[in-house]
Amino acid sequence: SVLGTDISTITDVDGRFTLKEIPEKAQRIRVKYIGMQPKDVKIRPIMNVTLDLEKKLAFFIQAGVGVSGYNLENNNEDIYGGNNHLYIQGGVGLNYNFSTYFSLQPSVNVVAKGCKNMGRRGSDGQGEITVDPVYLEIPVLIAARFIISDFGRLIFNAGPYAAIGIAGKGKYTDEWEGTSMKFDLFSGDEAVLKRFDAGVQAGFAYEIKHIGFSYTFGYGLLKPFKEWNKEWGATPHNISHNFGLKYIF
């Protein structure tokens, strides 16, 4: 079918087709066949179009880098810092295709997040804390796929995620005493983070055949810290910005 018009045709037994009286403004056609992925191609005098088999399930591996931190919002000048932390992640997942344009994308990822130099000053002293937690994160996203070129697809996705802390160290520095100590983030008497987190993710990706490039924003809905004094300001939440690379099998 010619996009933007009501002109269409069907192929013969050998897969050949002819389109006539195409308007000059028309630029692309869409080729569809049962059980195959549709493809939009630029109109040319002679076209050789190859369709890919439409899979219900497609596994993928992914890796990425990003920045994470906590959305510190307070009017207390004694609370400062919380610089964004550069992190890496990697994982596996699958696309379950409901249709040509919609799919479910569950995945399992190992994600290293955290923040640097979040500090508090007061009459009793001044200290800074850096946290480097590692989570096992499981997002379940709904994706919408749009064919925008002969080979490329634009993907928009969104959905919830759940995460469990599996490792991580923190460091506390006493600025007055000039001393520091390290501790486990999720276990022990000095642990400061809750082990479980959950939130929402949303993003977009561009896929070329088996390769995908993506951006994802994540926002935690649970309180990450075990203790947080209201005098320090609003309770912070996990936030993240991730840039990823995906290979689809």
Q: What are these model-predicted stretches?
A:
Residues 2-4, 28-41:
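A short, solvent-exposed loop/turn motif at the edges and junctions
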Residues 113-116, 188-249:
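Predominantly the C-terminal beta-signal and adjacent terminal strand-loop region
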Residues 61-67, 88-98, 108-110, 138-144, ...:
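Residues on the lipid-exposed face of transmembrane beta-strands in outer-membrane beta-barrel proteins
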Residues 54-56, 97-99, 111, 147-151, ...:
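Outer-membrane beta-barrel channels and translocator barrels
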Residues 73-80, 123-130, 186-190, 227-233:
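Extracellular loop and loop/strand-boundary signature of outer-membrane beta-barrel proteins
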Residues 57, 82-88, 132-138, 152, ...:
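Residues that define the transmembrane beta-barrel architecture of outer-membrane proteins
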Residues 5-16:
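Short, acidic Ser/Thr/Gly-rich low-complexity loop/linker segments typical of extracellular
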Residues 48-91:
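Short glycine/proline- and aromatic-enriched beta-strand/turn motifs that initiate or cap beta-hairpins
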